[in-house]
């Protein structure tokens, strides 16, 4: 068993993501564009693009928007050229923070990220200072009350890497990053629908924060996530609010 408040944290994070839907389309279009640029415009041959398209469809993005983003990535349409950038640092109580960006101006982006770290009690580190603390993987979260044995059997048969039962009754299925969509769809066909799922950088060791520390950490995470160039923010912090 693991994770004293995993379900609450996942629900809280999901709520914060829902509240930011105004920025979601912009971020998804960037990801589709860059995925197509890096690996080509065929989602069947480009797992990253397939995942980006699935996320866009889940947010009800119009088909034309998706297709135009792919064409900008492959050069069929003109558009802004985005570069990937990752910044690492520390939050409250030394919690690891990793910030993934897509930007057309790295000088602006690094200044914005550094300012957010400094303003809200964290500090930006050097490349690689916390990356080793995270694993690139898919994560599917199932609600408390799900049949653990049946889910475990179905998940491992579908190609999942691990199944973790948390203290709060929720169950986590871990997949490889590019196997995420296949495992998710296979489990849905078997009758198991995740409450939350994403490809993420999962912290290997968690830093539990409560009270003022949790509130301060939340402000730092919100500040980073609000930046236009930021796509994803990952942290080892578990907030007990």
From Swiss-Prot:
The keyword Transcription applies. It is found in: Cytoplasm. SUPFAM superfamilies: YebC-like (SSF75625). GO terms for biological process: regulation of DNA-templated transcription. One of its GO terms (molecular function) is DNA binding. GO terms for cellular component: cytosol. Keywords: Cytoplasm, DNA-binding, Transcription, Transcription regulation. Its main location: cytoplasm. It comes from the Bacteria. Residues 1-21 are annotated as: Disordered. It holds the Pfam family Transcrip_reg. Belongs to the TACO1 family. PANTHER family: TRANSCRIPTIONAL REGULATORY PROTEIN YEBC-RELATED (PTHR12532:SF6), TRANSLATIONAL ACTIVATOR OF CYTOCHROME C OXIDASE 1 (PTHR12532). This is Probable transcriptional regulatory protein azo0574. It comes from Azoarcus sp. (strain BH72).
